[in-house]
Amino acid sequence: MNKPICIIAGVGEGNGYALAREHERKGYFVIALSRNISKLEALFGGINTENVAAIACDLSNTDSIHSMYQSVLENHGKPSLLIYNAGNALFDSIDNVNINDCEMAWKLNCSGLLSLSQCMLPDLESASNPGIIVIGATASLRGTAKTLSFSSAKSAQRAMVQSMAKTLWPRGIHVSYVIIDGVIKTSITSDYFPDKDDNFFIHPESLAKRISALSEQDKSAWAFEIDIRPFKENW
């Protein structure tokens, strides 16, 4: 394949879909991953289009990740960019947390990222302009009373990505972390916040443009971490 290949892990209606379309617009062939293949098919109008391949993958399962990546290599080629957008925003506290939910949060945010990055590493090292972009959240910086599972997993993810960056930057692989500080506009969040106007939300298309710019940075001025929020967000 002549086009560079980008894997977007964790594609749904919001920023995952916007990231796929933004990188398609920039000339990438996009591998869109989700556990639910029917949702991907609905989003993209099919599981294989000219510039997008939708593939089912359970990012909490190492075997599923390895099988998916082998299929990508056999059918499409070697990717040069990973955008890891998987996660699950749980609301729980020490009073009601389920240890299984806590473990699943870690698997999606940390184990899945590690497994997929390890699969891709040999191909990234031989690629032109290789990168790993991980989508985080404010929960990576601090916990709240009701985000025990989510904040513990996200803070572990952020530390892991820092470690990855310190290893891989000298080898020419740009690893970066994006902290999302706000509510992304989707049909679900719009229904959940019916009294909020557009200024309350982060718009997925605008977010995707900011994130995609990370893979265009010159090596002399790489950013590791950026935070993105709407202008009215209280921070």
Please give the residue ranges for each predicted region.
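Substrate-binding pocket helix/loop in short-chain dehydrogenase/reductase
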Residues: S93-I94, N98-W106
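C-terminal helical subdomain
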Residues: P170-I173, Y177-I179, F193-W235
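Active-site loop of short-chain dehydrogenase/reductase
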Residues: K3-P4, K78-P79, S93, L124-A137, ...
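Catalytic loop of short-chain dehydrogenase/reductase
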Residues: G131-A156, V161-Q162, K166-W169
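Conserved glycine-rich cofactor-binding loop
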Residues: G12-G14
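Conserved glycine-rich Rossmann-like NAD(P)H-binding loop of the short-chain dehydrogenase/reductase
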Residues: K26-A42
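Rossmann-fold cofactor-recognition segment
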Residues: I47-D63
